[in-house]
């Protein structure tokens, strides 16, 4: 029996949230449920699980310790780190995932790497990509994955037969300045409106609606780290109250030829 005080237990279990099901997805036929859960109330590493509704049997579908290796520490892209900070996400492992319309396949990221899995056969494999991956989303038909990498939105086949996929929208593709990004939510949307994504698949998987964000009007702030005065200050665009916000527009692209 644990002799920890309540404050110690509350901290160790991350406010009594570890070990409970979260990010729940019910299949369209109601036969299975996909969810995230760690192995115990003091385990911070989330795994992906599949529940068969009729039998009540649970199957672990994806284990980060197997996918990355038990000795590999998480190396999060800046976008994923910011998302977790906004959501007060203290757990590790798989903290988000996406499924197709029938919950037959899923995609997730670990340390900026893209993984796709089959929920029927329970296998997981990595898809090679260009740069770190953020916010991957499966197309409704389960054939394609759209994801953000840097300031661009890319699309890749789940079969991995199109080497690294293709860039669907990005400042390099359109010869735009480095204040422009595609596929990510702007600061105000993510921080104040609880909208953390910047692109959406069409129901027929043929098109993607993508946010274009231009931060050129946003004021630049310089933030220094008092603990490391030898390091230069970071330049950050921050839309303080009463100042200009980013310019945001929505565009629709054909996802595949």
Locations of the language-model features?
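Beta-propeller folds
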Residues: 1-257
């Amino acid at each position: 029996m644990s002799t920890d005080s309540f404050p110690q237990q509350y901290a160790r279990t991350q406010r009594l949230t570890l070990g409970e099901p979260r990010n729940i997805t019910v299949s369209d036929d109601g036969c299975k449920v996909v969810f995230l859960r760690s192995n115990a109330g003091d385990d911070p590493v989330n795994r992906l699980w599949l529940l068969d509704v009729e039998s009540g049997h649970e199957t672990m579908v994806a284990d980060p310790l197997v996918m990355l290796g038990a000795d590999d520490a998480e190396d999060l892209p800046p976008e994923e780190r910011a998302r977790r900070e906004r959501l007060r996400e203290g757990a590790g492992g798989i903290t988000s995932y996406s499924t197709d319309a029938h919950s037959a396949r899923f995609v997730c990221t670990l340390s900026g790497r893209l993984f796709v899995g089959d929920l029927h056969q329970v296998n997981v494999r990595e898809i090679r990509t260009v740069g770190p991956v953020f916010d991957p989303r499966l197309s409704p038909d389960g054939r394609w994955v759209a994801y953000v990498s840097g300031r661009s939105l890319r699309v890749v086949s789940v079969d991995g037969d199109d080497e690294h996929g293709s860039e669907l929208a990005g400042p390099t593709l359109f010869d735009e300045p480095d204040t422009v990004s595609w596929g990510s939510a702007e600061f105000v949307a993510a921080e104040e409106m609880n909208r953390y994504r910047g692109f959406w698949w069409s129901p027929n998987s043929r098109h993607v609606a993508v946010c274009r964000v231009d931060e050129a009007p946003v004021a630049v702030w310089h933030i220094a780290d008092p603990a490391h005065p030898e390091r230069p200050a970071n330049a950050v665009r921050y839309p303080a109250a009463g100042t200009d916000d980013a310019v945001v527009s929505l565009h629709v692209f054909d996802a595949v030829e």
